[in-house]
């Protein structure tokens, strides 16, 4: 059921993390929010692992990661949390894969990636972990697609992505993994491709209409949304440098085409490097960076039923570069940058679901 209006949403503020961080890796498992690694105040990757008990609202320290890292991917596999790739203390991508065994409170090393990579996108389906793309030590974007078999602790290669990239957005819909955007070096990628898990083949869909860095992406009700970001200079605009935009582009999976929504349906605020998600039939955009000198606290939602944007309650702690995670009726916004790495943990909630 669609939730309507700003009154349908509220912020839930949790105790701050013991360790402030940005680019942390987050996972939700059995009523616990795990925050792993990331970069601290010194700007170096952390091996710190902490968990928030959602029932008691208390933080506990976990055994440190064997490999300090930031910007890693995480996948929950039953009672384990698998941490994949990332970047180490010398700013080099890592190949290390490690699993946290929740029942035993310890880490185990797993089969490493064939190539070190940061910005890997991961998806879990039926106990199999799919890893797509990444950036290697030579800074070149990767097209590799891997599947992890946990029973045999091994990575197998699958057909490569048509467009190499890192930091892409991925969505699992039916038997397909959709891969949108990402980057090649400093350049944003406009490719939109889908991998069929049954036939193990790739399909190229029409590319994003506009080239934007640090855009937000979400999927809801059979459509994929690409929001905001930094518009890149090009032959079709008069800007000489990147600029914040409030663009809204929507891809209809059934009809296979992009629609660039008119000016009247653009976001209320121009923003980039923000959190985006789907709650109660609404696409929500949270925080980020805009034309102001500090991070944004503003929050807005696009109702898929009413086809309009509405202001929501502001984020208690204005931030950008946050980690995020959706768990039921909550969209968690974790850490990030305020006036430095943040300890804040807050969740935008549907009032009826909390």
UniProtKB/Swiss-Prot annotation:
Transmembrane segments: none annotated. GO terms for biological process: mitotic cytokinetic process; mitotic nuclear division; nuclear chromosome segregation. Involved in pinching off the separated nuclei at the cleavage furrow and in cytokinesis. Required for mitotic integrity and maintenance of chromosomal stability. Protects cells against mitotic errors, centrosomal amplification, micronucleus formation and aneuploidy. Plays a key role of midbody function involving abscission of the daughter cells during cytokinesis and appropriate chromosomal and nuclear segregation into the daughter cells. It is found in: Cytoplasm; Midbody. Kelch repeats lie at residues 1-31, 32-79, 81-127, 128-175, 176-222, 224-281, 282-329, 331-354. It comes from Rattus norvegicus (Rat). Gene3D superfamilies: Kelch-type beta propeller (2.120.10.80). PANTHER family: KELCH DOMAIN-CONTAINING PROTEIN 8B, RING-TYPE DOMAIN-CONTAINING PROTEIN. SMART domains: Kelch. InterPro entries: Kelch-typ_b-propeller, Kelch_1, Kelch_domain_containing_8. Pfam families: Kelch_1 (PF01344), Kelch_KLHDC2_KLHL20_DRC7 (PF24681). One of its GO terms (cellular component) is cytoplasm. It comes from the Eukaryota. Keywords: Cell cycle, Cell division, Cytoplasm, Kelch repeat, Repeat. The gene is Klhdc8b. This is Kelch domain-containing protein 8B.
């Amino acid at each position: 059921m669609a939730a309507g209006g700003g009154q349908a949403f509220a912020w839930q503020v949790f105790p701050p993390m013991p360790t402030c961080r940005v680019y942390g890796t987050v996972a939700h498992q059995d009523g616990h929010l795990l925050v792993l690694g990331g970069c601290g105040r010194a700007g170096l990757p952390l091996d710190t692992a902490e968990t928030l008990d959602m029932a008691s609202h208390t933080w506990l320290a976990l055994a440190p990661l064997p490999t300090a890292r930031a910007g890693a991917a995480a996948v929950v596999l039953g009672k384990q949390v698998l941490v994949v790739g990332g970047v180490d203390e010398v700013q080099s991508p890592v190949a290390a894969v490690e699993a946290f065994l929740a029942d035993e409170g310890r880490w185990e090393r797993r089969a490493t990636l064939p190539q070190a990579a940061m910005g890997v996108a991961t998806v879990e389906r039926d106990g199999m972990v799919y890893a797509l793309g990444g950036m290697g030590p030579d800074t070149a974007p990767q097209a590799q697609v891997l599947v992890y078999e946990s029973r045999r602790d091994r990575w197998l290669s699958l057909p490569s992505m048509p467009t190499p990239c890192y930091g892409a957005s991925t969505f699992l819909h039916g038997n397909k993994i959709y891969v949108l955007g990402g980057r090649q070096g400093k350049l944003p990628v406009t490719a939109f491709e889908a991998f069929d898990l049954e036939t193990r083949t790739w399909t190229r869909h029409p590319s994003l209409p506009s080239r934007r860095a640090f855009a937000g992406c979400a999927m809801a009700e059979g459509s994929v949304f690409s929001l905001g970001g930094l518009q890149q200079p090009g032959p079709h605009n008069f800007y000489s440098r990147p600029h914040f935009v409030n663009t809204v582009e929507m891809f209809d999976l059934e009809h296979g085409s992009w629609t660039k929504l008119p000016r009247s349906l653009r976001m209320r605020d121009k923003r980039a490097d923000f959190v985006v998600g789907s709650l109660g039939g609404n696409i929500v955009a949270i925080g980020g960076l805009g034309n102001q000198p500090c991070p944004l606290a503003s929050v807005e939602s696009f109702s898929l039923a009413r086809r309009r944007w509405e202001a929501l309650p502001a984020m208690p702690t204005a931030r950008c570069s946050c980690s995020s995670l959706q768990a039921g009726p909550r969209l968690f916004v974790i850490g990030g940058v305020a006036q430095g790495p943040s300890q804040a943990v807050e969740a935008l909630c549907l009032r009826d679901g909390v």
